[in-house]
Amino acid sequence: MNDLKFKNLLIIFFIFSSPIHANEFWGLEAWMNSIRTPNFDQIKNIKTRKEAFFAYLLPEIKRQNSKIIELRNDIKSGRLDASTLSALKKYYRLNTQTTNTELLDTIDIVPASLILAQAAYESNWGRSRFAKYYHNFFGLWCFKKGCGVVPLRRSKDSTHEIVKFSSLSKGIEYYLLSINRNSAYDILRKIRKHKRDNQQPITGTGLAEGLENYAQIGYDYVETVQAIIRHNKLGQYDYRI
């Protein structure tokens, strides 16, 4: 098998093995990974806790963004065959007539500062039940009965559950997928495209403007995430991919 064919098969495997669905295999692997997760509750010093939190998440954020960059390079180079490109378009919920240029507008990185800030806010700096036991640092929901974990304070009229993941890697991967294909974040992707087209830096504070639909508090959420980025000087990580 030549390298080009292997590359296409590898991407197809990646698509079908990724956590597209919330109800993935979850058991011994999840338990083992939970043991390896730092106990942020026990770190009483706020500065130390934040440092531990960023140190835990940042390597995986860099790894996942690097995978996206590699995929973008494969698309640009023309190394992917028609069936692989078709599978990618389906995976990202795009029309089959989508051009490679349009595909690249969807498949792109998310700044590390934005990921870290959202994870900090959504998981209470890694101390939430969903972060500790289910590797969900981003408050990601699913809506099919049994797809995840039922929140303790869910209202009677609500049907959502919290997505559970077997590892931090799968949690971040799914978060990036959500940002890149969910219609709720179309504005974020347009901001990112504008930055790309004009050769401007892709920053967390800039892309946060497209997160008004991420939480029920609307634009207050945008301002909160931007404040976390600025206060913790997270912009320093945006160019370390």
Residue ranges and their predicted role:
Residues 5-12:
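Sec-dependent signal peptide recognition
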Residues 17-19:
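N-terminal signal peptide c-region/cleavage motif recognized by signal peptidases
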Residues 1-4, 42:
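Short, Lys/Arg-rich N-terminal segment immediately upstream of the first membrane anchor
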Residues 21-117, 121, 125-241:
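Catalytic cores of secreted/periplasmic lytic hydrolases that degrade extracellular macromolecules
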